[in-house]
Amino acid sequence: MASKQHAHILSLARSMIPPLHPKLHKGQAGRIGVLGGSGDYSGAPYFSSMGAMRFGADLAHVICEPSAGAVIKTYSPDLIVHTILDPQKSREDIRSALKGVMSRLHVLIIGPGLGRDDHMQSCAKIAFELAKDMEQMGVVVDADGLWLVQNEPKVVMDWPGVPRIILTPNVMEFKRLCDTMKINASGPHTSLCPQLATALGNATIIQKGPSDIISNGLKIPSALLSDESEEQNYLEVKVEGGLKRVGGQGDILSGSTGVLLAWGSEWVRGTYEHVGHPPPQDKAIAENIPVLAAYGASTFNRTVSKRGFQKKGRSMVTGDLVDMVGEVYEEVFGKPGEMEGRGKL
């Protein structure tokens, strides 16, 4: 993608970021939930939620199974941990508890550390059902949340209005989703993401790979494209990433994606208008917040991966990336007060 095109879309993504302002109260700059954390996996929900906090969210909640929660609570006092996915509780008790927590969130990230056992998959399905009925709830799906989508694709389909959902599959997860939806995965790689997004009800997809392909299956509106661009139904992020493929990098992506989706959605609702950041006047921008969030998060995640690899080489682990989120955020999006690059909307 030409640098002019990349700069234009990134400036639009930057426009979603709320200012740091004394008139904003705690929680208005992002209340993010991560549904995951099971008997076998406690690291992934930590990386996703702490990545979201380091990226700029005000609050991060982890919704998990009790044994995972006991461990996650020791990782950081900054996280709010809800151990409500208890296999000893009834489905209705879990639904009620989940509804109470989710009603406080802007975005729910489903999948980090979720696992594939029947109980945790059932909890994820309940969360999808609740989110679909919450008009202002955004959803990001990763890891074993995608396993549920593969087996029950209807959980991400038929959302009212503009689908407020972003999927972040890696190569194998993407192939399995294509198989489920009967899409020939041997076609041109830039055509597959739009096909899958269309089949899944126009959910936005980040198809992770050597470059990241982003699509909701629809034509990209001209407002998102530079003058030199041809008509297309996908965006491609070619920003260089790191060479170390370490477990947990996708959790950093899901966290940053969730924050940008929350910021963009609140921007459109006018939450930041009283601090000099009015909602976009262009309807095409307002209707493509998930696409812009995906593009900004992909650019950020590839950059933090590159910086981590440059610093640590083969020894790089995801904990190194969490520590670098703040500085790479400023590299990609600018420091507070250095926002002259916002898109003109």
Curated annotation (Swiss-Prot):
It holds the Pfam family Carb_kinase. ATP binds at residues 208-212, 241-250. This is ATP-dependent (S)-NAD(P)H-hydrate dehydratase. One of its GO terms (cellular component) is cytoplasm. It comes from Cryptococcus neoformans var. neoformans serotype D (strain JEC21 / ATCC MYA-565) (Filobasidiella neoformans). Signal peptide: none annotated. Residues 9-332 form the YjeF C-terminal domain. It is an enzyme of class 4 (lyase). NCBIfam families: yjeF_cterm. Keywords: ATP-binding, Cytoplasm, Lyase, NAD, NADP, Nucleotide-binding, Phosphoprotein. GO terms for molecular function: ATP binding; ATP-dependent NAD(P)H-hydrate dehydratase activity. Belongs to the NnrD/CARKD family. Its EC number is 4.2.1.93. Its cofactor is Mg(2+). It catalyses: (6S)-NADHX + ATP = ADP + phosphate + NADH + H(+); (6S)-NADPHX + ATP = ADP + phosphate + NADPH + H(+). The keyword Nuclease does not apply. It is found in: Cytoplasm. Catalyzes the dehydration of the S-form of NAD(P)HX at the expense of ATP, which is converted to ADP. Together with NAD(P)HX epimerase, which catalyzes the epimerization of the S- and R-forms, the enzyme allows the repair of both epimers of NAD(P)HX, a damaged form of NAD(P)H that is a result of enzymatic or heat-dependent hydration. (6S)-NADPHX binds at residues 113, 170-176, 251. One of its GO terms (biological process) is nicotinamide nucleotide metabolic process. SUPFAM superfamilies: Ribokinase-like.
